């Protein structure tokens, strides 16, 4: 595999990670999205309209955590070198993995840990991942924001179907966008099947995935321009 192929594969695995984390949050933390802020804002609006205070606080907590994660990652990767895989991206993912590790440990004591602590940990981690993935600049994929990815995918397909000049254009971005959406859904399916019987196993999967991504990036992409 080429260095670019490794990079694209690792980004796709980040989408899988986001799908897993998002559904863990939705099913176990009071029906709140910790990665998909579009859906979370919709839930927030519905909760305000219906005067459901618990959902309002949960959604606001996730939104605040996500914003904090984006700010943290921006400070880490914002001025990083423009290489195939900037070292700052790996450092940001290491911080994300650590935060998810703390979440996983606290999850064993969910009866004693306020749910808002767990929500904010997960949403911070996803905010960090979103900005780190965007730094890679691959087909506009951020790993968590799928609405824009879906729109770009449909534009690609429509252009190839209806405009002759686009029929022979390179398919890489189209394939990556489709793969991002598919893997996000696969992550959601995995958690849906695992909950609740294998909850204490599934929460470690994103950590293992991110660790594997970091190691592969270090071994295969370090120093690549």
Curated annotation (Swiss-Prot):
GO (cellular component) term, any one? plasma membrane
Protein location: Cell membrane
Spans traversing the lipid bilayer:
10-30, 56-76, 99-119, 137-157, 174-194, 197-217
* Membrane topology category: Multi-pass membrane protein
Superkingdom field: Bacteria
Short name of any one Pfam family annotated for the protein: DUF1275
Q: Which UniProt keywords apply?
A: Cell membrane, Membrane, Transmembrane, Transmembrane helix
Spell out the InterPro entries in the cross-references. Answer: DUF1275
Note the PANTHER family from the entry: SLR0142 PROTEIN (PTHR37314), UPF0700 TRANSMEMBRANE PROTEIN YOAK (PTHR37314:SF4)
Homology family: Belongs to the UPF0700 family.
Question: Under which name does UniProt file this protein?
Answer: UPF0700 transmembrane protein YoaK
What organism does the record attribute this protein to?
Answer: Bacillus subtilis (strain 168)
Source lineage: Bacteria, Bacillati, Bacillota, Bacilli, Bacillales
Gene name of the encoded protein: yoaK
């Amino acid at each position: 595999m080429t260095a670019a192929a490794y990079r694209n594969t690792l980004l796709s695995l980040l989408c899988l990670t986001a799908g897993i984390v998002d559904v863990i949050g939705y099913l176990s933390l009071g029906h709140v999205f910790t990665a998909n802020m579009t859906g979370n804002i919709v839930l927030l609006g519905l909760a305000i309209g219906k005067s459901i205070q618990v959902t309002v606080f949960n959604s606001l907590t996730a939104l605040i955590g996500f914003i904090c994660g984006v700010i943290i990652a921006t400070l880490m990767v914002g001025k990083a070198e423009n290489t195939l895989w900037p070292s700052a991206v790996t450092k940001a993912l290491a911080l994300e993995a650590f935060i998810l590790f703390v979440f996983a440990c606290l999850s064993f004591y969910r009866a004693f840990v306020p749910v808002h602590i767990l929500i904010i940990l997960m949403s911070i981690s996803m905010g960090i991942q979103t900005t780190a993935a965007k730094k890679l600049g691959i087909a506009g994929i951020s790993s968590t924001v799928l609405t824009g990815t879906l729109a770009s995918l449909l534009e690609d397909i429509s252009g190839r179907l209806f405009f002759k000049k686009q029929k022979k254009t390179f398919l890489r971005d189209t394939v990556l966008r489709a793969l991002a959406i598919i893997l996000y859904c696969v992550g959601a399916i995995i958690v849906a099947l695992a909950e609740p019987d294998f909850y204490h196993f599934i929460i470690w999967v994103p950590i293992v995935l991110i660790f594997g991504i970091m190691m592969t990036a270090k071994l295969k992409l370090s120093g690549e321009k």
